[in-house]
A protein has these predicted regions:
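Beta-propeller and closely related beta-pinwheel folds
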Residues: 22-194, 229-240
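Conserved beta-strand elements of the Class I
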Residues: 5-6, 52, 205
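Structural motif
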Residues: 8-11, 55-56, 208-210, 260-261
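Hydrophobic or amphipathic alpha-helical targeting/insertion segments
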Residues: 2-30
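Beta-sheet repeat architectures centered on beta-propellers
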Residues: 1, 99, 137-154, 160-334
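Glycine/Thr-rich phosphate-binding loops of Rossmann-like dinucleotide-binding domains
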Residues: 15, 61, 266
Length: 334
């Protein structure tokens, strides 16, 4: 929010850190005065500049009143004022469809809010209501709080029952590797699933834990630039060199940046955190190898896995290959 960094502990307090304050680098973040003390998610609505809490308290400061479907937003440009009055723009809203809010993402024209069953939009409309809420999808809930992104006015997300897109209408996305993903997915660790955009190549990737892992070990990618309605392009990556826990697109740093969790204990320095292990920070699309500190540069292997197909079967022109009808005699070399 401007030069103020805001961070939320899931189901906990919200903190602020002012980068412009004197001795800022030696000053700890502080709990935001007047803000809810227990919330599932949080973001800043732009350009109207309201701080919004999702799955939060009906009575501010009383954690026992946390309602997983309740939304509370501050007055405009005042992150300390959350009590609605005739003089401010603070307010509240409770969503009806679902049992808990799973996550929210800022979009081009609205904030997208997902419960465990449904999709809602939250649009700034000004006085007297400040925001308008609309349910725009059912049976399409979000699988984890970081499993959705918005790109070019469209929202993409991973649900418990497939992949979805919203472009003004709800669409279930055809995914050629859906069984491969969902048949080996740790749904208990669903909050680890992380979705990131690589706009340099027009790709959306979901990093997820397999059924035998408690950390992200595999990914599935959708090419939103090259896909068509009849020819969606998906690919997976199970390389041990490419698990990622978070991802930030090149729009922020010029190149994609990501992190990886290494569960092995590094005895060269003290580790402070919830579990033993280290997090490694990567800048992507730099060079051709993966380089970790203290290790040898390694190229991430490329491979293609295909399945059986019958070249004698007629296909609609362009539907399967984006090429002409390929029936006829000849050699098929793999």
């Amino acid at each position: 929010l401007g030069s103020t960094l805001i961070a939320l502990i899931h189901n906990g307090e919200c903190f602020q850190w002012d980068a412009d304050a004197a001795n800022a680098t030696s000053t700890r973040a502080t709990i935001i005065t007047g803000a809810p003390t227990a919330s599932r998610d949080m973001l800043v609505s732009t350009p109207d500049r309201h701080l919004v809490f999702f799955g939060t308290e009906t009575t501010i400061g009383n954690k026992a009143t946390q309602d997983d479907m309740f939304i509370r937003f501050s007055s405009q440009e005042n992150i300390n004022d959350y009590t609605p009055t005739a003089e401010n723009s603070a307010g509240t809203q409770r969503l009806a469809a679902g049992s808990r809010i799973m996550g929210a993402t800022l979009g081009r024209n609205a904030i997208y809010i997902w419960s465990d069953t449904s999709l809602f939009t939250m649009r700034f409309v000004g006085t007297p209501f400040t925001f308008a809420f609309e349910q725009v999808g059912t049976n399409c809930g979000l699988i984890g709080m970081n499993a959705a992104v918005e790109v070019d006015g469209a929202a993409y997300w991973m649900s418990d029952n497939g992949f979805f897109r919203y472009t003004g209408k709800l669409e279930s996305m055809d995914c050629l590797v859906e069984d491969y993903v969902y048949d080996d997915l740790n749904t208990t660790s669903n909050q680890l699933i992380y979705c990131g955009i690589n706009n340099l190549f027009g790709e959306i990737t979901w990093f997820y834990p397999t059924s035998t892992s408690n950390v992200n070990t595999r990914s599935v990618t959708y090419s939103y630039l090259d896909s068509t309605a009849k020819r969606p392009i998906w690919f997976t990556n199970a390389s041990t060199l490419f698990p990622r826990t978070t991802w930030e697109d090149s729009a922020v740093f010029g190149l994609p940046h990501a992190t990886k969790y290494n569960a092995s204990d590094d005895t060269s320095f003290d580790v402070t955190g919830n579990t033993e292990g280290t997090t490694i920070y990567f800048e992507h699309e730099t060079g051709v190898n993966q380089q970790e500190a203290g290790t040898t540069a390694v190229a991430i292997p490329a491979n293609i896995t295909s399945g059986d197909y019958d070249i004698t079967q007629k296909v609609v022109r362009g539907a399967a290959t984006n090429m002409a009808d390929l029936r006829g005699d000849g050699e098929n070399i793999m």
